[in-house]
């Protein structure tokens, strides 16, 4: 008997609310753009060194999701949620040294790992207690909440810094998010839900490496364009003559669009399965990138940037459900941990490669053509993927 069969609706709602609070708070690690200039002034380092703090965080987000299935078996959700709440505070004590290495360890390692653990654990818990016919929407909500956390704290951090200064404002921000995670812990404990797990030996025989490779490549290529556009939105807008305020508005709309699209994509998955919506999203994405390569209007540019970022949000919202459908719920945490490394790899390669191509050509034409080609290959990989829902 699985957890889905013994959990009632009240318990599901409490668990979902807890996981949404956790992912909302852990998504704030991606509000790093509001910290970067203050970190540079505090530590007296340049842009490349300060950017390495966020790169370290991305690596540790990916690592936490990758090893998460081991932690889910060894520790109770309550213990893990406690550590999710406390690790950023430990990191805060280290980053308060006001040194570059302190930020690498405190923010990059401790907060980054906590963020990935919170995201992965929430996906695992929600997929364990949600009926299959509602799984896409539930996981879409979790992914969207992660994005919304970045949006809200991108606005909250500057407010706190203006009124309290950078150091005290950052302390206040982390105390707020840690407190919210503890509220999530209380909600989960109140639900009294017990997660039932199958033995890993009975699961191992169902692994299909070819399927996992296709899932990995589909994810890597599917998010490549979105990560490149998100990472270079400000310089792309600047190259078209856009102002700083235009860039800030675009970034906010892109992140909001990503979250909203994730919710809608989850709703579509519950009605049409994963493959058809995913193919449709990738086709629209390819068309948007093609339009991006030929247009010259700043207003159209903003629309296309928001569209591509929103489609990226839809892809990352669909993928946990896609993995669960293809390999089964018992294997989904372990397999998704492996597949999620595609996101981490794309997150490190895509913006860096786009920056290198820009320096070589002094424009983004080569980067856009590359992402267009990659998006077409992503469509072909998903098209050839055998898809059926496995119980």
Where are the language model's segments positioned?
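C-terminal ends and interior cores of transmembrane alpha-helices
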Residues: 86-99, 284-296
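Extracytoplasmic gate region of multi-pass secondary transporters
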Residues: 32-36, 210-265
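C-terminal transmembrane helical hairpin of 12-TM major facilitator-type secondary transporters
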Residues: 254-258, 269-322
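A late C-terminal transmembrane helix in Major Facilitator Superfamily
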Residues: 327-361
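Hydrophobic core of transmembrane alpha-helices in multi-pass small-molecule transporters
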Residues: 102-117, 300-314
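Intracellular juxtamembrane helix-capping segments at the cytosolic ends
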Residues: 117-130, 314-327
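Helix-loop-helix hairpin linking two adjacent transmembrane segments in secondary transporters
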Residues: 142-192
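Helix-to-loop junctions at the C-terminal end of transmembrane segments
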Residues: 64-76, 262-273, 358-359
């Amino acid at each position: 008997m699985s957890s889905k069969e013994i959990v009632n609706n009240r318990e599901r709602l409490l668990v979902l609310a807890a996981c949404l609070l956790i992912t909302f708070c852990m998504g704030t690690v991606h509000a790093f753009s509001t910290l970067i200039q203050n970190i540079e002034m505090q530590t007296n380092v340049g842009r490349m060194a300060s950017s390495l703090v966020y790169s370290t965080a991305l690596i540790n987000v990916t690592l936490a999701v990758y090893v998460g299935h081991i932690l889910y078996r060894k520790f109770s959700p309550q213990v893990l949620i406690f550590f999710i709440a406390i690790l950023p505070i430990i990191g805060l004590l280290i980053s308060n040294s006001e040194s570059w290495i302190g930020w690498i360890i405190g923010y990059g390692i401790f907060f980054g790992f906590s963020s990935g653990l919170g995201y992965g654990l929430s996906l695992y818990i929600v997929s364990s207690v949600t009926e299959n016919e509602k799984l896409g929407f539930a996981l879409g909500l979790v992914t969207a909440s992660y994005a919304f956390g970045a949006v809200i704290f991108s606005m909250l951090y500057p407010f706190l810094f203006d009124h309290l200064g950078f150091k005290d404002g950052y302390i206040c921000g982390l105390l707020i998010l840690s407190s919210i995670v503890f509220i999530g812990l209380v909600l989960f404990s109140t639900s009294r839900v017990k997660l039932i797990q199958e033995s890993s030996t009975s699961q191992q025989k169902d692994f299909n490496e070819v399927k996992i490779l296709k899932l990995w490549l589909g994810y890597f290529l599917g998010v490549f364009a979105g990560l490149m556009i998100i990472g270079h939105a400000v310089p792309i807008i600047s190259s078209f003559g856009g102002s700083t305020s235009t860039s800030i508005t675009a970034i906010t709309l892109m992140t909001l669009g990503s979250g909203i699209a994730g919710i809608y994509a989850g709703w579509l998955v519950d009605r049409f399965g994963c493959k058809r919506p995913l193919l449709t999203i990738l086709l629209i994405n390819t068309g948007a990138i093609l339009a991006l390569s030929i247009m010259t209007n700043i207003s159209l540019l903003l629309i296309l940037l928001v569209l591509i970022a929103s489609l990226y949000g839809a892809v990352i919202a669909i993928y946990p459900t896609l993995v669960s459908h293809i390999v089964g719920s018992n294997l989904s945490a372990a397999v998704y941990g492996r597949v999620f490394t595609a996101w981490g790899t794309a997150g490190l390669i895509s913006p860096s490669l786009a920056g290198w191509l820009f320096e070589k050509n002094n424009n983004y034409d080569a980067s856009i053509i590359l992402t267009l080609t990659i998006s077409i290959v992503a469509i072909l990989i998903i098209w050839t993927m055998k898809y059926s829902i496995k119980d």
